[in-house]
UniProtKB/Swiss-Prot annotation:
InterPro entries: GLR_AS, GLRX1, Glutaredoxin, Glutaredoxin_subgr, Thioredoxin-like_sf. Keywords: Cytoplasm, Disulfide bond, Electron transport, Redox-active center, Transport. This is Glutaredoxin-1. Gene3D superfamilies: Glutaredoxin. GO terms for cellular component: cytoplasm. The lineage of its organism: Eukaryota, Metazoa, Chordata, Craniata, Vertebrata. The keyword Metal-binding does not apply. PANTHER family: GLUTAREDOXIN-1 (PTHR46185:SF1). It comes from Gallus gallus (Chicken).
Length: 101
């Protein structure tokens, strides 16, 4: 059930952030990504507050339990610090998956 929930949120041409509302790193990731001009439906923020089973799933599948979990297309690129490190590459990556206007 957790696997199908997570997989239902991922698409090749979309960026998906799994976040918790009280997490400052999650808020920073959202701010960073909202600087880009995404096509409608190509940026989704999924609040998993209170869903520890999803974090357990991420531990098994990505090696990390922390949030945010950032997916570009169907690939997990990590958390906020990983997103920051890739900031210069993001425009090209987002264009490659067809997520930008």
């Amino acid at each position: 059930m957790v696997d199908s929930f997570v997989q239902s949120k991922l698409r090749d041409n979309k960026v998906t952030l799994f976040v918790k509302g009280s997490c400052p790193y999650c808020k920073n990731a959202i701010v960073l990504l909202k600087e880009f001009n995404f096509l409608p439906g190509c940026l989704e923020v999924v609040d998993i507050t209170g869903m520890d089973d999803i974090q357990d799933y991420f531990q098994k599948t990505t090696g990390q339990r922390t949030v945010p979990r950032v997916f570009i297309g169907t690939k997990c690129i990590g958390g906020f610090s990983d997103l920051q490190k890739m900031e210069q590459q993001l425009p090209m990556m987002l264009r490659q998956i067809g997520a930008l206007v």
